[in-house]
Amino acid sequence: MSTVIPKIALGAWSWGAGAAGGDQVFGNHLFEEELKPVFEKAMECGLNLWDTAAVYGEGTSERILGNFVKDVRRNSVILSTKFTPQIAGNSPDAMQKMIDVSKERLHTDVIDVYWIHNPMDAPKWTPDLIPLAKSGQIKTIGVSNHNLAEIKRANEILAAEGLKVSAVQNHYSLLHRSSERAGILDYCKENEITFYSYMVLEQGVLTGRYSEENPFPEGTGRG
């Protein structure tokens, strides 16, 4: 059963370290000591949808968020995480194994929003969301980094079992408007799908933090 999800999510991509972590991607060094006040202030302001992924920081992002979640009422926070095909392996229960690890890190039995992180072999993986939804392990299904045809295909697969894509998360900003030009925003509006933009400020480029004179830290993925 789909849950009502807010229009604003707070991302935890840059939390923690390691491959796909904040240090290697952005040059950040953000751990629990720095992030706990951010979590507490956001929750105080009513911002309670937290978005992470199994791959972020090789799991450290989920672990940090999970440690914060332990200190609040579970129904006061909405947890969003992702199945990343590239680290899944080939076992028939790969998605179940990945979500089990995510649930353990996040200290929860239920994931409020569960995404297929990118479209690599998405038609193969999308059907595996169905038993997770029907068993109550996930409440809402999302797809990330999918083009319009891939979103429609995911919806077709899910619709056969009475389910649907309820959220799309793509790179979108004033500098990167492919989802708009491709008709994804219109499709989401027409089908009551919540669209989430990530990198909406281009990690500080649009706020003036980074420029040719002040680039991302050398050696990082963004640099």
Walk through the language-model features, giving the residues of each.
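Beta/alpha (TIM)-barrel catalytic core signal, keyed to glycine-rich beta->alpha loops juxtaposed to Asp/Glu
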Residues: 119-223
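N-terminal binding-site loop/beta-alpha segment at the start of enzyme catalytic domains
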Residues: 1-77
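Acidic (Asp/Glu)-rich catalytic clusters
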Residues: 2-5, 44, 66-76, 100-107, ...
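Acidic-and-aromatic substrate-binding clefts and catalytic sites of carbohydrate-active enzymes
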Residues: 53-62, 86-91, 117-124, 148-149, ...
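A short, structured active-site edge motif that brings together acidic residues
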Residues: 75-87, 114-117, 169-172
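A short acidic, helix-capping loop that chelates divalent metal ions and anchors anionic groups
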Residues: 17-23, 85-90, 206
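Conserved, mostly hydrophobic/aromatic
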Residues: 10, 35, 42, 50, ...
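Short, acidic/polar
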Residues: 27-42, 89-107, 122-127, 148-155
